[in-house]
Amino acid sequence: GLLASLGKVFGGYLAEKLKPK
């Protein structure tokens, strides 16, 4: 659903933000 899609996108965004370059 929409929430699941948003959660996946937000989770990926957080992972990229927190992941050391």
Swiss-Prot record:
GO terms for biological process: defense response; negative regulation of nitric-oxide synthase activity. Keywords: Amphibian defense peptide, Secreted. Disulfide bonds: none annotated. Signal peptide: none annotated. Its main location: secreted. The keyword Secreted applies. GO terms for molecular function: nitric-oxide synthase regulator activity. GO terms for cellular component: extracellular region. Expressed by the skin dorsal glands. It is found in: Secreted. Has no antimicrobial activity. Strongly inhibits the formation of NO by neuronal nitric oxide synthase at micromolar concentrations. This is Dahlein-5.6.
